From Swiss-Prot:
Organism: Staphylococcus aureus
Superkingdom of the source species: Bacteria
GO biological process: response to antibiotic
Pfam family, one: CAT
Family membership: Belongs to the chloramphenicol acetyltransferase family.
Active-site residues, as the UniProt record annotates them: H189 (proton acceptor)
Keyword annotations of the record: Acyltransferase, Antibiotic resistance, Plasmid, Transferase
EC code(s) of this entry: 2.3.1.28
Disulphide-bonded residues: none
Class in the EC hierarchy, top level: transferase
Summary of subunit composition and partner proteins: Homotrimer.
Designated name of the protein: Chloramphenicol acetyltransferase
Functional summary from the UniProt entry: This enzyme is an effector of chloramphenicol resistance in bacteria.
SUPFAM superfamilies recorded: CoA-dependent acyltransferases
Length: 215
């Protein structure tokens, strides 16, 4: 997949990037997303919630260049044409998880089938990363399905050059006849401001509400 180099000297975000990159400023934001219709539609059509959420996340990410901006293995700043999800799958027997990646696809059915094939092949492997090689253009996604939460924060101080979002989903819960799920975003301020965090949340909620257009 193509990695497009950003020439820092000509980038309109240069001042912001250098300031927050040097400070290593990251932040997290958690929002409860209304999945009432989404959950009902997924159940009616026989689709699992987790891969359907992953698909919706990747639709937002791949629509917006800011969420695909990072530093590649050659230490170059730029953005990927497309990201693929790298998601966690829990093993009840070992009480550990694996990370599996699946090729992104704009077509939900194609993505879902690819997800199911990858899950069948790799979910019982006792490795942290069973599907290799892992491409550089992957986005970390995980789910903590045992609890809902109002705040969630990750700290990755051992890798100062990781600029891509990290997304964590919690357990869904009911309130006032609605079903909600917490979604936590971990962002690097060098590339994503509060506006971009809001952009992700609003577009994600929108695609979830319009589930009957794609599922």
């Amino acid at each position: 997949m193509t990695f497009n180099i950003i020439k820092l000297e000509n980038w309109d975000r240069k001042e912001y990037f250098e300031h927050y990159f040097n400070q290593q400023t990251t932040y997290s934001i958690t929002k409860e997303i209304d999945i009432t219709l989404f959950k009902d539609m997924s159940k009616k059509k026989g689709y699992e919630i987790y891969p359907s959420l992953i698909y919706a996340i990747m639709e937002v990410v791949n629509k917006n260049k800011v969420f695909r901006t990072g530093i590649n293995s050659e230490n170059k700043l730029g953005y990927w044409d497309k990201l693929n999800p790298l998601y966690t799958v829990f093993n009840k027997q070992t009480e550990k998880f694996t990370n599996i990646w699946t090729e992104s696809d704009n077509n939900f059915t194609s993505f879902y089938n690819n997800y199911k094939n990858d899950l069948l092949e790799y979910k019982d492997k006792e490795e942290m990363f069973p599907k290799k090689p892992i491409p550089e253009n992957t986005l970390p996604i995980s789910m903590i399905p045992w609890i809902d939460f109002s705040s969630f924060n990750l700290n990755i101080g051992n890798n100062s050059n990781f600029l891509l979002p990290i997304i964590t989903i919690g357990k869904f819960y009911s309130e006032n006849n609605k079903i909600y799920i917490p979604v936590a975003l971990q962002l690097h301020h060098a590339v994503c401001d509060g506006y971009h965090a809001s952009l992700f949340i609003n577009e994600f909620q929108d695609i979830i509400k319009k589930v009957d257009d794609w599922i």
